[in-house]
């Protein structure tokens, strides 16, 4: 819920349109065990004050009549629904954060690989990059799936993060 509220105000906070569009999230379930998992997630969301719904097959047919219910490869039993959920344009979001960081004095170097991290006593002293060395007093890692690699490079041990492939189907209007 907290995350969703942050997204709802992010364009205003960054003074940059991140193109956040709340169109709901409907997660179909195709087996009794998937239904149980959806019910578990639904209950967790409700306990945290997030509006969520569990739809049985009749609710689903009433709300989304155009799905292929009869000839679907996997039987559709129902869905977990979060009506306020949505998505944002990833590139707009990145540029909004980059512009905000720049206005706070952050230097952003694109296409620049970190090759090493120099520590003195218990502090990071410099970052070695494919473009040379950068002396610094503060470091922030914002590199998505590569964060754990840099964390180890800095000698900070293992982060409990696993990277997983994510596929998205993105469409844009052709003009």
Each model region followed by its residue ranges:
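Dinucleotide-binding Rossmann-like beta1-alpha1 core, especially the glycine-rich loop
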Residues: 1-66
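Internal, well-ordered alpha-helical segments in soluble enzyme and binding-protein domains
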Residues: 3, 37, 41, 56-59, ...
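Helical element adjacent to the flavin cofactor pocket in flavoenzyme catalytic cores
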Residues: 75, 79-138
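Generic secondary-structure signature for well-ordered alpha-helical cores
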Residues: 5, 9-12, 47-50, 65, ...
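Residues that scaffold the ATP/ADP-binding catalytic core of kinase and kinase-like folds
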Residues: 63, 117, 150-153
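Central helical "cap/lid" subdomain
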Residues: 129, 133-175
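Short aromatic/hydrophobic contact patches that present stacked aromatics
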Residues: 25-27, 79-82, 168
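Alpha-helical scaffold segments in soluble metabolic enzymes
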Residues: 6-9, 40, 96, 100-103, ...
């Amino acid at each position: 819920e907290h995350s969703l509220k942050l997204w709802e105000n992010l364009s205003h906070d960054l003074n940059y349109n991140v193109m956040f569009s709340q169109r709901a999230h409907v997660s179909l379930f195709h087996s009794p065990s998937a239904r149980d998992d959806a019910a578990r997630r639904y209950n967790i969301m409700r306990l945290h004050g997030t509006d969520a719904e569990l739809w049985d097959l009749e609710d689903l047919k009433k709300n989304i009549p155009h799905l292929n219910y009869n000839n679907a490869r996997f039987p559709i039993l129902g869905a977990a629904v979060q009506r306020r959920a949505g998505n944002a344009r990833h590139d707009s979001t990145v540029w909004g954060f980059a512009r905000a960081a720049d206005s706070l004095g952050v230097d952003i170097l694109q296409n620049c690989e970190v090759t090493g991290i120099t520590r003195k006593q218990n502090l990071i002293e410099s970052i070695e990059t494919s473009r040379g060395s950068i002396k610094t007093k503060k470091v922030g890692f914002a590199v998505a799936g590569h964060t754990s690699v840099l964390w180890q490079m800095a000698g900070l041990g293992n982060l409990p993060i696993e990277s997983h492939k994510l596929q998205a189907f993105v469409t844009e209007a052709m003009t």
